């Protein structure tokens, strides 16, 4: 005969694991990748702005593996090739803090894709 306590404990652990997995799920987010000044990166998508890194401060794990994002069109707005472009990022995020908590991959996109998206605010 199975102990009811053991069954409940097992169910509780399974539920806790599924909640943790949901919080750590990798999402594809597409929008304006902004790099206005050295060390500052953010993504502006349909749901708002997500901080990827701040100069002298927060750095999302994985940002060092970001490829050259200027290959599909990049608008230079500041010295040293700083500006913005259109991109899709595979990321984990913290909804409350609006931080990218892990950058898994990044793909530059043509500027036209973001410009034509009616749900995407301007950069």
Model-predicted segments: where are they?
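Bacterial N-terminal signal peptides
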Residues: 6-16
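Positively charged n-region of N-terminal signal peptides that target proteins for export
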Residues: 1-4
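Beta-strand-rich cores of mature extracytoplasmic or soluble domains
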Residues: 64-123
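N-terminal secretory signal peptides
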Residues: 22-77
């Amino acid at each position: 005969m199975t102990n009811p306590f053991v069954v409940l404990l097992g169910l509780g652990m399974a539920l806790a694991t599924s909640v943790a997995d949901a919080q750590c799920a990798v999402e594809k987010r597409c929008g304006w990748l902004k790099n206005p000044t050295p060390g500052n990166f953010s993504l502006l998508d349909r749901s708002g702005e997500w901080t990827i890194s701040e100069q002298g401060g927060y750095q999302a794990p994985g940002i060092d593996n970001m490829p050259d994002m200027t290959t599909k069109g990049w608008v230079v707005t500041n010295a040293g090739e700083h500006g913005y472009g259109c991109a899709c990022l595979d990321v984990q995020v913290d909804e409350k803090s609006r931080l990218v908590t892990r950058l898994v991959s990044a793909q530059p996109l043509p500027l036209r894709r973001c410009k034509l998206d009616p749900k995407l605010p301007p950069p």
